[in-house]
């Protein structure tokens, strides 16, 4: 039945762009930015199409299911740190774009980190939470044995949510400490 319905194979069996970046083979990552954005690349299930994940995240944002604080601070921190600490052999902007769009960053920032039960309550705490998730993600991607660090970063920051909420709790007006 395959020759009748499909003229060519639609399976990609190769290293993901993040694993190529992790191993230092920056020349192996020869994908166009548009290919990476629409998901025409190798990758794990659920993290392929940044475009569709972005559409889903923006839909939740516009329907007021989530706020902008966690996704923007999470993705922004990863973008800033990967740009600032890009390898000398790579173009910093290209390295940053591939690092942001390759892997589960969009899935984690838009859908996992914004879970009602595990994210901080107020906006300041949510920004701190997103920055922490982004910093831990970059640390794991650069220095640990894993290509991806989003899920581990979210789990570690979930342990600190109670402390972030305690530190960023608004003080009632007129009350002395």
Identify the meaning behind each predicted range:
Residues 85-90, 95, 135-148:
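Hydrophobic alpha-helical transmembrane segments in multi-pass integral membrane proteins
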Residues 140-177:
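Cytosolic-side transmembrane-helix boundaries in multi-pass membrane proteins
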Residues 57-61, 79-83, 108-109, 113, ...:
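Alpha-helical transmembrane segments of multipass membrane proteins
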Residues 1-54:
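Long hydrophobic alpha-helical segments that form multi-pass transmembrane helix bundles
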Residues 51-54, 72-80, 99-113, 127-135:
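Hydrophobic alpha-helical segments embedded in the membrane of multi-pass proteins
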Residues 61-72, 116-127:
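Membrane-helix interface "capping/anchor" motifs
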Residues 67-88, 92-99:
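Transmembrane helical segments that form the transport core of multi-pass membrane transport proteins
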Residues 96-103, 126-128, 145-157:
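Loop-to-transmembrane alpha-helix initiation sites
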């Amino acid at each position: 039945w395959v020759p009748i319905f499909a003229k060519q194979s639609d399976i990609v069996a190769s290293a993901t762009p993040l694993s190529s970046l992790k191993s230092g083979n920056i020349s192996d990552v020869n994908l166009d930015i548009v290919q990476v954005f629409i998901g025409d690349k190798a990758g794990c299930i659920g993290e392929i199409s940044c475009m569709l994940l972005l559409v889903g995240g923006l839909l939740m944002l516009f329907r007021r299911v989530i706020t902008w604080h966690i996704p923007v601070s999470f993705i922004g921190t990863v973008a800033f740190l990967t740009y600032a600490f890009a390898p000398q052999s790579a173009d910093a902007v290209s390295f940053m774009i591939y690092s942001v769009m390759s892997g589960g960053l969009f899935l984690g920032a838009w859908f996992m980190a914004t879970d009602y039960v595990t994210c901080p309550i107020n906006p300041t705490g949510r920004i701190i939470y997103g920055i922490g998730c982004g910093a831990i993600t970059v640390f794991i991607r650069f220095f640990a044995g894993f290509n991806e660090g989003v899920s581990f970063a979210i789990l570690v920051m979930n342990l600190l949510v109670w402390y972030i909420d305690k530190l960023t709790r608004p003080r009632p007006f007129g009350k002395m400490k």
